[in-house]
Amino acid sequence: MIDLTSNNSTELNNLKRKVATYKEVVANTRAYRDVWKESLHDKILEILKGMVDNCSLEATVETKSGMENLEAIVLSLGDVKSGMWQEINSNIKRHLIKHNGSLIYQQLFNGKIIVLINYPFIENYGQPRPPKTIGIYRPEELKEPFFVRHMEEFISDITNWEDYDDDEPSKRIGFDINFSNMNVAEE
């Protein structure tokens, strides 16, 4: 048996602190899940629906609950025909469907909330971009101003996706860039 009373008191105290931290984290997970069920879920739904209505944004807000304590609230801009299609024959066209993007608030395994942007994509046309993580929050951190910022970032990113082009001026690189404005006397 290990003697824990000898000069190992520092190590034992370190271990005790780590155990206390672990217990606190596990208790927080339970508390975060309770807050989600008791109030946060409904608060997020209400705020997102309010912003959709207030801004006249064509979107749906719904809860996806395939697994307990991993629910997600999804603000979706919906699905539409992309305007592109494959002609099967003179009478039939197979339309490519465009998913317009979504803003997601999802519970994580530890009760915290991850906020994600799913970018638009067109089925069978390239690969969808991976979701963008806006942030991970403890329930008490999600105040109303955060929701407005998340929505602004979502709309900006979706707008940039829709307005994609490669006409952005190229960034010049090279040795002489810093010297381009210098007047060099000719010999």
Residue ranges of model-derived segments:
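Charge-rich, low-complexity N-terminal segments
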Residues: M1-M67
